[in-house]
Amino acid sequence: PNLKDFTFVGEEVVELEVKASTDKITMNCAEITISSASVNIGGENIESKDINYDKEQEIVSIQFPSKLQLGAGLLSMKYTGELNDKMKGFYRSKYTTPNGEERYCAVTQFEAADARRAFPCWDEPAIKATFDITMIVPKDKVTLSNMNVIEETAHQEDSGLKIVKFARTPIMSTYLLAFVIGEFDYVEDRDEDGVLVR
């Protein structure tokens, strides 16, 4: 996320299974602009040329030029969004330092159906998935998520950034997912099963 202009960019890959003949994928999406979407099934990559939003229903329809093959595949998307000031979805939160300086952090509040403001998804509590979260953040900031950090590396193209990869979550609803970026301190210990907790 960019904590100066309050925007974020994302890349998402969804494992899915096409069970019925269709040329359209519909999912929840609010206050996000998808710049590209494609599906790869059976080694065939199909780019979408038509992405339509129903802002009132908070739904995006990704249209493909031909029917998708049946079977397992990957839906890949690139998108941008706003770190809003509405305290829902992926939003900015203002705080004041001890010397009186105003600063911002980026936090999430997805319950009950606001994950759609951070990434396109099927954002209903009954629909569950696992999540592999990777955050690209300023190297002087701390990022936390549901799971432990499994890898942290310097960004190859921007020395001011770092890439933080978290372990895969258990299968869960979108509203249970969380991540934060900011000037945080944290305590670290192991639970009774030896899992590192921050």
Annotate the PLM regions:
Residues 1-198:
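Acidic/His-enriched low-complexity segments
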